[in-house]
Curated annotation (Swiss-Prot):
Signal peptide: none
Complex formation: Part of the ribosomal stalk of the 50S ribosomal subunit. The N-terminus interacts with L11 and the large rRNA to form the base of the stalk. The C-terminus forms an elongated spine to which L12 dimers bind in a sequential fashion forming a multimeric L10(L12)X complex.
Biological processes, Gene Ontology terms: translation
SUPFAM superfamilies, per the entry: Ribosomal protein L10-like
GO cellular component: large ribosomal subunit
Key word rRNA-binding present: yes
Protein name: Large ribosomal subunit protein uL10
């Protein structure tokens, strides 16, 4: 093998390794059996959510994962493999892939990485049930507002009760 080919492969592995480093989550799937239309629809939905899906050689994936300390993923890099990387929303790849896996039996989630930790299939499926970032932020805002809202209602009720009392 020529030095040029080896250098090119090393550059590909380095690029994948950088994607693993910068990703908040990555989901590894087996896509064998999906039609072109299904893969196109999946890629479109992932892209709209800010997720990048790539079909990569298992050897490159294994080397890049090992370089980042994700040796536990070596077993999932077998057969046709695609990886969905997200740099922003750690839930998006899991949620979208789980949705498509439910719709199409051909798509199988193998494993992944969440917040720089290797995640099992069960963990990814649990993550897929969580709301997206905006949903989580709105839930947090609601929880933070509840005590203030309740206090305001109590103050209003006390004020109304004082207004209704006859003057003595």
């Amino acid at each position: 093998m020529s030095e040029q080919a080896i250098a090119k492969k090393a550059e590909i592995v380095k690029s994948i390794s950088e994607q693993f480093k910068s990703a908040t989550s990555a989901v590894v799937v087996d896509y064998l059996g999906l039609t072109v239309e299904q893969v196109t629809a999946l890629r479109k939905e992932l892209r709209e959510a800010g997720v990048k899906m790539e079909v990569l050689k298992n050897t490159y994936l294994r080397r890049a994962a090992d370089a980042n300390g994700y040796e536990a993923l070596d077993d999932v890099f077998k057969g046709p493999t695609a990886v969905a990387f997200s740099n922003d929303d750690p839930v998006a790849p899991a949620r979208i892939m789980a949705k498509y896996a439910d719709q199409f039996d051909a798509l199988k989630i193998k494993g992944g990485i969440i917040e720089n930790k290797v995640a099992s299939l069960d963990t990814i499926m649990e993550m897929s049930k969580m709301p997206d970032r905006e949903g989580l932020l709105s839930q947090l805002a609601s929880v933070l507002q509840a005590p203030v809202r309740d206090f305001a209602l109590v103050v209003k009720a006390v004020a109304e009760a004082k207004d209704e009392e006859p003057a003595a």
